[in-house]
């Protein structure tokens, strides 16, 4: 079973993560992921979560926008052997997702990419 950490910014995209999150979590579960959720409540939380707990997981996923992704990556850069990164873009601009051609504000499609 794949250990997946999902760091969720509930303020990203005006809280749009709620739409489809349950379906995405069900898909991840059926795909063999044991998912643990971490919710941010302020600036820097995603960095600290990733740095403190990231090494305990096979994949660290980010549910949020460009800022949340940046924080997660900053935290993972502190680790000697960082895990793989998954991204469920749910921000307002999602510039990173646009550049990489990732589905935006579509939790289920993004969850499928994490499984692959």
Language-model segment annotations:
Residues 2-116:
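Small-residue-rich beta-alpha loop regions that form the catalytic core of phosphotransfer
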């Amino acid at each position: 079973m794949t250990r997946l950490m999902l760091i969720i910014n509930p303020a990203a995209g005006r809280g749009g993560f709620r739409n489809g999150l349950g379906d995405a979590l069900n898909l991840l579960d059926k795909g063999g992921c044991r998912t643990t959720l971490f919710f941010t409540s302020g600036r820097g939380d995603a960095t600290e979560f990733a740095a403190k707990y990231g090494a305990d997981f096979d994949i660290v996923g980010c549910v949020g926008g460009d800022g949340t992704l940046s924080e997660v990556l900053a935290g993972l850069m502190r680790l000697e052997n960082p895990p793989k990164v998954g991204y469920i873009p749910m921000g307002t601009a999602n510039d990173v997702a646009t550049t990489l051609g990732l589905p935006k504000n579509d939790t289920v499609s993004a969850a499928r990419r994490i499984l692959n």
